[in-house]
Amino acid sequence: ARMVTDSSVRFPRPASALLRMSARSVLSAPVVIAVVNTGDLLRRGTDLFQVDKEAAHDFFRTMEIQSSAAAVENLLLAATSLGLGSVWLGILFLIKDEVLDFLGEPTGEFMAVVPVGYPARPEHPGPKKQPLELKVRYLD
């Protein structure tokens, strides 16, 4: 929490407030999961698929980011299905170097931190959802 509080002063008020809220989430959660991209696909994908490294770099880099994001989303859905609360703390990417120092320099690229625990207010249903028709557009 001190790391986040100390670092938050470098940012404007909205980001600073989100960083402090993130610190509280991390401190209060019984489990905190850090998602780190090991870069295996970028390193081995060009050999595996026998494609030119230069041409394939952007493709494999994008796939690594998408895979990490999908893993985090699946983690959030699984936690919710078990009655647990979780949150994807993307704001911590603003202080990723400090987070990596705190995590002990894991091998790979920092992608996300997800605190998991029991909701403080289980009766609170979360934000009201808008009708699907307002969010989805079908193309003919």
Predicted regions span which residues?
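N-terminal amphipathic, basic helical "cap/leader" segment at the start of enzyme domains
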Residues: A1-V31, L139-D140
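Glycine-rich, charged/polar anion/phosphate-binding loops
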Residues: A17-L19, V99, E123
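Carboxylate-rich helix-loop segments that flank metal/cofactor sites and access channels
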Residues: R20, V35, D40-G45
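Structural motif
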Residues: P30-V32, S86, E109-M111
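C-terminal helix-cap and adjacent tail motif
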Residues: E109-D140
